């Protein structure tokens, strides 16, 4: 009896794994596949545009090819998503969440920097030279921004894996508040007769 009372109210690992397998293989299998394919495709598609821009602006110095870094992160994230769909596991969910968060931040920073570089570079170049370069830069930025949006949707999809969590938390908080208010009412009723008897003794 005591063991059952002291046992934490948490799901067993086997039950959690079964729910995760149902979520990844049946409920969200199609969406995970679309996410993984989109991330891998965007990561590969931005490579030629980024290298072309780098070769035209800085003699093929890949260090300046900033969109390559979120592209590599997106490729890794897509592989993790495919692995989660193939063989669901708790640590893969955490790895997918961390990689998507990192990819979102890195991609957003890359987009902001590339947009600023494009705006400043276009103003200083001739119109005949800037047209082709502008198309390549905008294409690389569009693919990077698409990767950011895909990572955002992936994080949203992961947050919906346990939709009742926040509702249960609010319900427990409400029950706790009601319990505290009931305790205050009971303590007030218990202190009432004591105060009244003290007043009667004072009058006597």
Curated annotation (Swiss-Prot):
Instruction: Note the PANTHER family from the entry.
Output: TRANSMEMBRANE PROTEIN 253
* Location, primary (coarse class): membrane
* Membrane protein topology class: Multi-pass membrane protein
Q: Which residues form a coiled coil?
A: none
Region of interest: Disordered = 184-204
Report the GO terms under cellular component: membrane
Spans traversing the lipid bilayer: 33-53, 62-82, 96-116, 138-158
Please provide the record's keywords in A-Z order: Membrane, Transmembrane, Transmembrane helix
What is the protein name for this chain? Transmembrane protein 253
Protein's UniProt keywords contain Oxidoreductase: no
Q: Where, per UniProt, does this protein localize?
A: Membrane
